[in-house]
Design a protein with these regions (language model features):
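Multi-bladed beta-propeller domains
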Residues: 22-47, 74-101, 125-157, 190-201, ...
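Bacterial N-terminal signal peptides that target proteins for export
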Residues: 1-8
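Hydrophobic or amphipathic alpha-helical targeting/insertion segments
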Residues: 105-136, 160-174
């Protein structure tokens, strides 16, 4: 079912109507007027954006409808083109394995060999001859070479379980022993006359995890060597998880390893011929978890650009091949992806969330840590597209209240050209108010959080309107952000007479280690408490009916929705919960234990995060739904 449709059906009671059917929607009071207002809004309001590209180091191509313009970044001159140039092919992307899976066949870089996984074993084909790299693999027994456990693909983004070295000499591969991991049964094809049964080794909190080893086969010596992936036993210390595998410029295999609690993360390098392993970087967080999915970037042959959180925020650091770690930035805010590496001038351009309301800013800093400078206006948030040589940048700038503006700047932050401007003057003529930027204090009384309030169409402050919160609320991956200051047109729920409230909560990434740690061992507490505080703030706004508040979400957002209506029944009066995890004992180990700690160490926290604990509190309307093959 379409989520937005489901929300309207469930929340119809908030607006005072019942017996909803989709085909009767236009007959509801105010719906036709709202749809007409949306059409007027779409036809009269434009937000500046660009789907353009850099044709060369100084020419930016900007398509607008059937027209195309070229901007010369050196002079700022705009030229109308009679024909649209061919867009250069984009790098990256490509095929991906299925969710939670890994590739089953891979060719060597030089094309001289191919590795294949089948039925628990890995083989290598060279010059038409096939060599078995493993022989005792057996999927039925839970032994696999060249294929990973499901949690590795799903929770650690490991989409390769074997691979070649850049020079094609070595083949690395996993060995997994899942024999102690319980089997999970999943019924599929339930809409067909005959359903099917799928099985998966699926570890839940408190259960054994898959045991992992890492091997390298040398195509020259025909020898297989086991890498030293851990200093002790599998269940003791680091090396419980082995992931993010690749090759360094000096020929060593690198990987990340973590303990089961994921409070220690080490970047390691192994000699492919001896298996001897050296730790290059170690990060710890005894009060929470260490994110293991931050990318690394090789710079030259002797160092990597990596993330460290040692000052409480994600910052850049140089990691040497000898294991020395040298901080490069020291923001009291989190950095985001590099924008451009200028190796010739030894300058890094990157983004950092140090603007107003944690908006992303473009920064530059020398490779030696000197000359750090912000190049964008901290009152706004920015998205950046560098020219191929990094001399110019297309910057889209906006805030919660300032509509987008697209400009070209140089490497000193000087504006060279305006590419596109927004036209939002017609918002009020279409019957809408601009979205309002708000702040409120977190439930612990120590943290300022952000919010946005969307007003219903044709808003009359003398009337009362129901309010909806679309939510997620849970932890986020590397370089994702808990709040993004952006200018938003009124939400489509507003067309049907709803306020829409977006709220920030503690727990996700983007605002430092302490902000994340607020969720540790107690999912379902801090984020729900903060959303309730956001509702309390919004209830003071004219027109908000504090007795008709709904909440909707999917996945972790579904969990947030069900916990909100159960823990705060006087704040939330209807909830739509799609694909929620209602009890963390039933989710997988790798995700759950990262944020909730081990079950035996935190039974109280698991109980407190279980929806059924609060079932007796339900007062309002709760809708729970799943797909027919939810994993």
């Amino acid at each position: 079912m379409n989520i937005r449709r489901a929300l309207f059906l469930s929340f119809a009671l908030l607006a005072g109507v019942t017996g909803v059917a989709q085909q009767r929607l236009p007959s509801y009071p105010g719906v036709r007027e709202g749809q007409a207002a949306r059409q007027a809004l779409a036809s009269s309001v434009s937000l500046a954006r660009t789907s353009g590209w850099w044709q060369d180091n100084f020419t930016f191509i900007h398509p607008v409808g059937n027209e195309t313009f070229a901007f010369d970044a050196r002079t700022g001159q705009r030229t109308a083109l009679t024909a649209r140039p061919t867009r250069p092919a984009a790098g990256g992307g490509g095929r991906q394995p299925g969710r939670g899976r890994q590739f089953t066949t891979l060719a060597s870089p030089d094309g001289s060999a191919r590795a294949d996984y089948k039925d628990g074993n890995l083989s290598l084909t060279e010059n038409g001859r096939t060599t078995a790299l493993s022989q005792d693999g057996d999927e039925a027994r839970g032994i696999k070479y060249g294929s990973a456990s499901w949690v590795y693909g799903e929770e650690l983004a490991q989409n390769e379980a074997f691979g070649f070295s850049p020079n094609s000499r070595y083949v690395w591969f996993y060995r997994f022993d899942e024999s102690r991991v319980p089997i999970y049964y999943l019924t599929l094809n339930q809409r067909d006359p005959q359903s099917t049964l799928a099985t998966e080794r699926y570890p839940k909190p408190g259960q054994p995890n898959p045991e992992v080893e890492l091997y390298i086969f040398d195509r020259q010596t025909r020898q297989t060597t086991r890498m030293q992936v851990r200093p002790g036993a599998f269940d003791e210390g680091v090396g419980h998880y082995i992931f993010r595998i690749g090759w360094l410029a000096d020929g060593r295999l690198y990987f990340r390893r973590a303990d089961r609690r994921q409070q220690v993360l080490e970047l390691c390098a192994s000699d492919p011929t001896t298996g001897i392993t050296k730790v290059l970087q170690r990060e710890t967080n005894p009060e929470g978890w260490v994110d293991g999915d931050f990318p690394m970037f090789p710079v030259g042959n002797d160092r990597l650009l990596s993330i460290t959180e040692r000052n409480g925020f994600a910052n850049w650091a140089w990691v040497g091949m000898d294991g020395t770690v040298t901080p490069l930035t020291s923001h009291q805010a989190e950095v985001r992806r590099p924008v451009h590496f200028d190796d010739q001038n030894q300058v890094l351009f990157y983004m950092a969330l140090d603007g107003k309301r944690h908006g992303a800013q473009l920064w530059r800093v020398g490779y030696n840590g000197q000359g750090a400078a912000r190049l964008t206006d901290p009152e706004l948030a920015h998205q950046v597209m560098p020219s191929p040589d990094g001399q110019f940048f297309v910057v889209t700038s906006q805030s919660d209240t300032v509509p987008p503006l697209v400009r070209i700047i140089d490497r000193n932050g000087q504006v060279k050209a305006t590419v596109a401007e927004s036209n939002v003057e017609s918002i009020s003529r279409a019957g809408y108010r601009r979205t309002e930027a708000l702040t409120f204090t977190s439930a612990d009384g120590r943290t300022e959080l952000n919010a946005r309030l969307h007003y219903p169409v044709n808003f009359d402050p003398s009337k009362k309107y129901p309010m909806i919160l679309p939510v997620y609320g849970g932890p986020l991956g590397a370089f994702q952000t808990s709040w993004n200051p952006s200018f938003e047109l009124p939400d489509s729920y507003c067309d049907y007479g709803f306020f829409v409230l977006e709220v920030e909560n503690r727990g996700p990434s983007g605002r430092g280690v302490a902000f994340k740690n607020a969720m540790y061992r107690h999912m379902g507490r801090a984020e729900i408490d903060d959303m309730a505080k956001g509702v309390e703030m919004a209830r003071t706004k004219p027109g908000v009916d504090g007795n008709r508040v709904g909440i909707i979400g999917t996945s972790y957002g579904g969990y947030t929705s069900i916990m909100a209506i159960l823990r705060y029944p006087d704040h939330f009066h209807a909830a739509v919960s799609n694909s929620n995890v209602s009890d963390w004992r039933n989710y997988d180990t790798t995700y759950t234990e990262r944020y909730m700690d081990l079950l035996e160490r935190n039974v109280e926290g698991y109980d407190a995060g279980r929806a059924a604990t609060y079932a007796a509190n339900l007062k309002g309307a709760l809708m729970i739904y799943y797909g027919t093959a939810d994993d």
